[in-house]
UniProtKB/Swiss-Prot annotation:
Belongs to the TrbE/VirB4 family. One of its GO terms (molecular function) is ATP binding. PANTHER family: TYPE IV SECRETION SYSTEM PROTEIN CAGE, UNCHARACTERIZED PROTEIN YJGR-RELATED. Keywords: ATP-binding, Nucleotide-binding, Virulence. The gene is virB4. This is Type IV secretion system protein virB4. It comes from Brucella melitensis biotype 1 (strain ATCC 23456 / CCUG 17765 / NCTC 10094 / 16M). It holds the Pfam family P-loop_TraG. It comes from the Bacteria. ATP binds at residues 457-464. The keyword ATP-binding applies.
Length: 831
């Protein structure tokens, strides 16, 4: 006799689990057989990222799911699906040599303490039930059959299950990332001790105990082996005790269903802050049984006069659709088990879950009869314990069990190792942010993949803080980098100044009329550098539209090569001028290279300074990527100065090009459109967007003016050649700029426009998938004073560094002390 559920037991009435476990043995790497001879296989499904998906696409996926159900429909087949929401915890491990980055990282991950980090895991189980005659021969009179015959019957059943499994895997492989790895069968594996373990049994054991643990494949029957807890069933509450914890559960099922089951109708539960398990089963009916069921439903409506004319007409339509094969019918059951650590909390969580279900049109009720039966019905094949079995169409089932989930990004196996950082999300799902976009579970470490990133956000949305936070987090990639790492930040309005200096970098604010600290002639006298210097000087002497003749080129080359043979401290543009020969006639002398070059020199040959001496003729060059791995250059002033913009850009880009030598490299551009407006930067960005990945580098581009970026000279490269797109809130976002220019979907655009500017949320997109993330830095006042790059804090920073030096360990405490004193004084004055 099979185990019978006892109703209305007292909470402390222990029940033995064995009679309620239908499984007998593991008969293959992915297959379990039950006592009744059913063959069972389970898959883990990554899930369709619904949160930012267009509704039309979700409907298409629902129809495709219905098509799959129709394809595998047979009264020999049944499905169990599970949505498991449980608490999780994660912390990316990083090593920082810089104290500011290390302290920021520790404080940031410390802020996750008490945060409800949750994960949603989706599972689909397929049960293949051999025909009754074969079941009878196999299991009731097996004694009369040979062992070989029994194995042959089993082999045929597994082959049929394989066929069904192939259809499922083909249809659901896109329920994940772009790599087609949205579904993974639960299989056996060997642990480090060589013992054979089973993911499938681990999942079934979790359903019984609420705990994930390694489960070895036993030699004894599974019903005697699984279940590492004790279950006590009360009228409405179940107590589950294990060696490590005691938990309480309450069940919810449906007394009546919503009028329509659009895909994701149950998704509201996936934002809750408590653990639960949703179990749904669907046992396919034959077409005849399905038609009989619908006909009985129609007759009931007619006989009881409960149904309106429209409802009866809907039943007629459903019968016609069933006949056409638009869907199939099945026996369906739903249960939601909500968990908590105490009775009061589980009651509160249950009430919250019921409100969500009822808001979506379901008549939900707490399971008060056969409470334990609903618990055991979580296990696939426990048909006898299913509460409130109903007839349902496969189309409805596709809406209720639609395998929606949240995108999480990629934690490990990225080109530079672990993800850049961990972010919070509205659902509590951990989100892993990366520059590079790499597929699925592949280990792409050290592979040269595209990593260019674009950040779009209006003023006040948090763009500067996000960029600087990412810059600080990226310092971890210096650790264990065989050739080192380098960051070059092309800044605007000195937004990154505090961060660059705090992480031990060097920051040069290029102001019109003030020495830049640039001296290109102190570079190593390599052939490549000399050729660059010749080109640079040619640009200097042709800025006013002057033509550079072949003779001019020869004179420039001779002067530069002469100077580059001198000691470094003697090499500068003024020395080049001294070595440029004059023309042989008056006309040549009037428009000579020397006269044109003089305005760029500290000494123009008459003891006077040239107009632009401050640009490239400084006594000591301040750029050295061997002493600093992080450089910041502020272009606020010089980018609007057409006279000096191109020469400065050429030198900066040449020095950066020299640093792109195989080491990990990131170049950052704030208000990128402004930088690429110059021809030198435009050419560089256009080429590097395509090639920098091969050199182990990437670019990060940001702007608060999408139209300017889209209208830039290299818009196509900045739009198309990116791996990661980040969109901060923008209530004033222009539809055509975002959808036509950046190719975001309508749903993504609506999210970008509807997110609150104070929410610190943003949308991250890679490939065709996106997720909503949040960088939460509440309580980070000291750190935000550095990361935000405000002008008043930059002024204070300059004062402090001028007094105590540029060692961050020295100036940071002084800066914070004075900043707080300034705020306190301001508050006092305000009173």
């Amino acid at each position: 006799m099979g185990a019978q559920s006892k109703y209305a037991q007292q909470l402390n009435n222990e029940r033995s689990l064995a009679p309620f476990i239908p499984f007998r043995s593991q008969v293959g790497p992915t297959t379990v057989i039950t006592r009744d001879g059913d063959f069972v296989r389970t898959w883990r499904i990554a899930g369709l990222a619904f949160e930012t998906q267009d509704k039309e696409k979700l409907l298409i996926r629902k129809d495709q799911l219905n098509t799959l159900f129709r394809a595998i429909a047979s009264n020999n087949v049944a499905l169990w699906s599970h949505n498991v929401r449980r608490r999780t915890w994660d912390h990316l491990k990083s090593f920082f040599s810089n104290p500011f980055c290390d302290a920021l990282d520790k404080k940031y991950y410390g802020s996750f303490s008490g945060y409800r980090m949750m994960s949603n895991e989706l599972y689909l189980t397929v049960i293949y039930r051999p025909v009754p005659a074969k079941i009878s021969r196999l299991f009731n009179v097996a004694v009369h059959r040979s062992h070989a015959e029994i194995l042959q019957e089993q082999k045929l059943a597994i082959r049929k299950l394989d066929e069904i499994g192939n259809q499922i895997e083909t249809s659901l492989r896109r329920y994940g990332g772009d790599d087609g790895r949205g579904i993974e069968v639960l299989s056996t594996y060997e642990d480090k001790h060589g013992a054979l373990c089973s993911q499938q049994l681990e999942f079934y054991n979790f359903l019984l105990s609420g705990e994930w643990q390694k489960v070895r494949v036993p030699s004894c029957p599974l019903d005697e082996y699984l279940g590492t807890g004790w279950v006590y069933a009360g009228t409405e509450t179940i107590e589950i005790r294990t060696a490590s914890a005691t938990r309480y559960a309450r069940g919810i099922d449906f007394k009546d269903y919503a009028n329509h089951t659009e895909p994701g109708i149950l998704n509201g539960l996936m934002y809750s802050d408590y653990e639960y398990v949703i179990t749904q089963s669907f046992s396919f009916m034959t077409k005849r049984d399905g038609k009989e069921f619908l006909t009985r439903q129609k007759q009931r409506l007619q006989n009881t006069e409960d149904g309106s004319a429209s409802q009866i007409m809907e039943m007629d339509i459903a019968i016609d659709q069933l006949g056409r094969g638009d869907f199939v019918m099945g026996e369906y059951h739903y249960s939601l088990l909500v968990f908590a650590e105490d009775m009061e909390t589980v009651r509160h969580n249950t009430s919250h879950a019921m409100n969500i279900l009822q808001d979506n049109g379901f008549l939900a009720t707490v399971i008060a009869t056969a409470t334990d039966a609903a618990f055991y019905a979580q296990l696939p094949c426990n048909w006898r314990y299913r509460p409130r079995v109903a007839g349902l169409t496969s189309l409805n089932f596709a809406g209720l069990s639609c395998f929606h989930n949240f995108r999480a990004g990629k934690r490990d196996g990225n080109p530079w190792g672990q993800a850049l950082t961990l972010l919070k999300t509205p659902s509590g799902q951990p989100a892993y942010l990366n520059f590079h976009y790499s597929k699925g579970d592949e280990d792409n470490f050290d592979k040269k993949l595209l990593g260019n990133t674009r950040i779009i956000g209006q003023s006040g949305a948090g763009k500067t803080v996000l960029m600087n936070f990412c810059l600080a987090q990226a310092q971890k990639y210096l650790h264990n980098a065989p050739m080192g790492m380098c960051n070059v930040f092309f800044d605007k309005d000195q937004g990154a100044k505090g961060t660059i200096l705090a992480i031990g970098g060097k920051y040069l604010a290029i102001r019109n009329g003030e020495p830049t600290g640039f001296n290109p002639f102190q570079m190593e006298p390599t052939a490549g550098n000399i050729l660059f210097l010749e080109k640079l000087v040619q640009v200097l002497v042709s800025r006013d539209g002057q033509h550079v003749t072949t003779t001019d080129e020869s004179r420039i080359s001779h002067a530069i090569r002469t100077v580059m043979r001198m000691r470094p401290e003697l090499r500068r543009l003024s020395t080049v001028l001294q070595n440029v020969t004059e023309g042989s006639d008056r006309q040549d002398r009037e428009n000579s290279v020397a006269k044109r070059l003089a305005k760029w020199c500290f000494d123009d040959g008459t003891g006077k300074r040239g107009t632009f001496w401050w640009v490239l003729d400084c006594p000591q060059d301040q750029i050295d990527f061997n002493t600093h791995s992080n450089y910041g250059f502020d272009g606020t002033d010089f980018l609007d100065n057409a006279d000096v913009r191109t020469p400065i850009s050429m030198y900066l880009l040449h020095r950066m090009e020299l640093a792109i030598d195989g080491r990990r490299f990131i170049y950052w551009m704030d208000e990128a459109w402004k930088w690429v407006d110059d021809e030198a930067f435009s050419e560089f960005a256009n080429n590097k967007q395509l090639t920098i990945r091969k050199q182990n580098g990437l670019g990060v581009f940001a702007t608060q003016m999408p139209s300017s970026l889209l209208n830039s000279k290299v818009a196509s490269a900045l739009v198309q050649q990116v791996a990661t797109e980040i969109y901060l809130p923008n209530p004033k976002a222009d539809y055509h700029e975002y959808t036509d220019g950046f190719k975001v979907t309508n749903e993504e655009f609506d999210i970008i426009r509807s997110m609150s500017e104070e929410s610190r949320m943003f949308l991250v997109k890679q490939g065709h998938h996106s997720m909503i993330c949040r960088l939460e830095l509440n309580g980070f006042d000291d750190e935000l004073a550095i990361l935000s790059g405000s002008s008043d804090n930059n002024e204070l920073l300059d004062q402090v560094i001028a007094e105590v030096g540029d060692d961050p360990s020295v100036w940071l405490p002084v800066f914070q002390e004075r900043r707080k004193a300034r705020i306190a004084s301001s508050k006092s004055t305000g009173r």
